[in-house]
Design a protein with these regions (language model features):
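A contiguous active-site-proximal alpha/beta segment in oxidoreductase catalytic domains
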Residues: 1-44
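C-terminal helix-rich "cap/oligomerization" subdomain common to oxidoreductases
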Residues: 4, 172-216
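Mid-domain beta-loop-alpha active-site segment that forms a flexible
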Residues: 8-16, 39-75, 87-88, 192
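Alpha-helical elements of Rossmann-like donor-binding domains used by nucleotide-donor carbohydrate transfer enzymes
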Residues: 19-22, 63, 91, 172, ...
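Short, hinge-like loop/turn segments at secondary-structure boundaries
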Residues: 22-26, 51-54, 91-93, 121, ...
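Conserved G/P- and acidic residue-centered "switch" motifs that form tight phosphate/ATP-binding loops
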Residues: 27, 99, 210
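A short glycine-threonine-serine/GTX helix/turn-capping micro-motif
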Residues: 48-54, 156-164
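Contiguous beta-strand/loop segments that form the cofactor/metal-binding neighborhood of enzyme cores
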Residues: 55, 59-138, 163-182
Length: 216
């Protein structure tokens, strides 16, 4: 049908993630080696045993793919916090098609108050860390005692809160549709959303079978 889909993968739609992506594309991290991703909030709702995996981690997996490419294999362990009936906290190990290795930790058991999200990507030339979605991004060049720190709001145009990530995501989608971008080239396309879901399906299978599962 040649339709454009703009999936609401809003967590990476902000200037901090775009700057970090620019560093990767410029080669400032060198050959990519690993990625560590974490996200946690308090969500007491109980539904599917895999609610936390399915609802929270399309965002985290999308961020990991944004920086490091497609994921080919997943291993997942999970636990239930006191009083929980669902798998409310999970740990993933991942291998990417390009050889990068990664870890992802997620939880519905920790109340917000301090930063809820962290992404670290490292390569032979250095690493970066994004704190709390868009609040701060730091570049650590390898072999250097110096670091480069960008802190919101001084650099990032006054992003006030999490709601601004939705505005950024919608603005980007409207801009690309207006420019006539092909469906497959949409940033946060339907294909990107499906790719994240395939990773999570493999993670659920891994949790059930206690094996490493290849992403279908």
């Amino acid at each position: 049908l040649n339709r454009c889909f703009g999936i609401d993968l809003n967590h990476r739609f902000n200037p901090a993630h775009r700057l970090a992506k620019q560093w990767v594309e410029e080669g400032r991290l060198g050959h990519l080696l690993f990625i560590n991703m974490a996200m946690w909030i308090m969500n007491p709702r109980e539904s599917s045993p895999y609610f936390q995996l399915k609802a929270l981690h399309p965002h985290t997996v999308d961020i990991m793919r944004y920086f490091c490419g497609d994921i080919e294999a997943v291993q997942c362990f999970a636990t239930k916090a006191p009083g929980r009936k669902i798998w409310s906290t999970a740990q993933f190990n991942m291998r990417f098609v390009n050889g990068v290795v990664g870890s992802l930790t997620g939880s519905y058991d920790i109340a917000r108050g301090h930063p809820m999200e962290r992404c670290e990507v490292a390569g032979t030339g250095g690493r970066f860390v994004i704190e709390d979605i868009f609040k701060q991004v730091t570049l650590y060049p390898a072999g250097s005692l110096e670091k480069i720190v960008y802190t919101e709001p001084s650099l990032f145009g006054g992003m006030r809160d999490f709601v601004d990530t939705f505005r950024d995501r919608i603005k980007r989608f409207v801009q690309q549709v207006d420019e006539g971008v092909a469906p497959e080239d949409i940033d946060g396309s339907g294909a990107d959303g499906l790719a994240a879901q395939k990773v999570l399906a493999a993670a659920i299978e891994s949790l059930e079978t206690e094996t490493v599962v290849r992403v279908g």
